[in-house]
């Protein structure tokens, strides 16, 4: 689902989004961003 990467990918404190983005892309999303240290797929 849309938040399938929240628990699978960490969001670092200073904007290291790559892990989140890669996870989201793997699940067919366009990418991801970090909000409040949680990964959100877009």
From Swiss-Prot:
Q: Does the keyword Secreted apply?
A: yes
Q: Which cysteines are joined by disulfide bonds?
A: 5-23, 11-34, 20-39, 24-41
**Where does it live in the cell?**
Secreted
Q: What molecular functions are annotated in GO for this chain?
A: potassium channel inhibitor activity; toxin activity
Q: InterPro entries in the record, alphabetically?
A: Ergtoxin, Scorpion_toxin-like_sf
Q: In which tissues is it expressed?
A: Expressed by the venom gland.
Whether RNA-binding counts among this entry's keywords is no
Which keywords appear in this protein's UniProt record, sorted alphabetically?
Disulfide bond, Ion channel impairing toxin, Knottin, Neurotoxin, Potassium channel impairing toxin, Secreted, Toxin, Voltage-gated potassium channel impairing toxin
**What Gene Ontology cellular-component terms does the record carry?**
extracellular region
> What's a Pfam family in this record?
Toxin_17
Domain statement: The presence of a 'disulfide through disulfide knot' structurally defines this protein as a knottin.
Function of the molecule = Blocks Kv11/ERG potassium channels.
Q: Which family does it belong to?
A: Belongs to the ergtoxin family. Gamma-KTx 1 subfamily.
What is the name listed in the Swiss-Prot or TrEMBL entry for this protein?
Potassium channel toxin gamma-KTx 1.2
Tell me what organism the protein belongs to. Answer: Centruroides elegans
